[in-house]
Amino acid sequence: MKSLVKTAKGPGNIEVRESPVPKIPKDDWVLIKVMAAGVCGTDLHIWHDQFPYWPPVILGHEFAGEIAEVGSAVRRYKPSDRVVSEPHSKSCGVCHLCRQGIVQLCKEKRSPGWGMDGGFAEYVTMPEMLLHRIPDGMSYDIAALAEPMAIAVHHVTERSKIECQDFVLVTGAGPIGIMAAFVAKAAGAAKVVITGLDSCEAVRFPAARKLGADVVVNVQKEDACAIVMDMTDGKGADVVIETSGSQNAISQSIRMARVCGRVCVIGIPGPDETPVPWKAAVQKSLVMEFCMSSGYTAWDKALSLMAGANKDLSSLITHVEPLENWEYLFGELTAERGIKGLFLPKE
């Protein structure tokens, strides 16, 4: 089968290879025929050697497909079922986090695409416990957005707990930021403002508007803080969702939140340590949530939300390519000339 492989440590070292179709490793696992697979920022970081991985490994953890084969202990799924999968494979199941259902943060976890072979291939294996059915009528392309959408749902609704009539600010107009704006609006936010850069003007800002952002702000041309304060009569945002990882955006998130507001941090900064206006956060009595990945409940909610917005979400998919065009697609997404790129491994 065709596959996109990170062959060795170091920048680059990615190539399309012929790999054997994987065998089901355990009785409660399934073999999935991959129909569409999304490119994540993590894949780009692995390309540049900026994220942990165990080569040689097939990349990709955002995928949708059809079950080709099931293990003898699989009970809820059968061949031909359409599924997506959470990426939290190889969690230990016995640590204090796993026992609380927080398998995504288990230290033993080795997700597809970096810790085990992933979905940038014609086939991938996953455990039954991580599967979710694709709703009837939803295309594989849209279903491949489930993983980042689940992250947005988990952080925006389950952690930030957005309430009806909240004023929500999203910093960063990347895929997660745009999805966070979409989820916030669906959760009842009265106003959603999203910030971005010059590079967002052509594609990302129009998609954000289409998916629910009331106002877009180019921070290279406008003063986001002044705009937010003007729109809220000087109070600030009820909820700030920080998705960019930018040092300036992290600082501004605290300054633009209202007293007793909520700040949800999703974006991961480059440096290990990032200065923040801690005094301002304390004086405002802010609630700050630091979030990583997503859980089972968020996936169910995300798929339900996506099923009701199937057509709207197509604006997020700006590139669709075969695996052979990986370098072009990675370059386009790195340059922010798109939002979500998909591979169709069978083409």
Language model features with spans:
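Glycine-rich beta-strand-centered segment in the early N-terminal region that forms part
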Residues: 22-37, 48-96, 130, 135-137
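A glycine-rich helix->loop->beta "capping" turn
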Residues: 231-239
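C-terminal hydrophobic helical "lid"/dimerization subdomain
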Residues: 3, 222-223, 251-255, 296-347
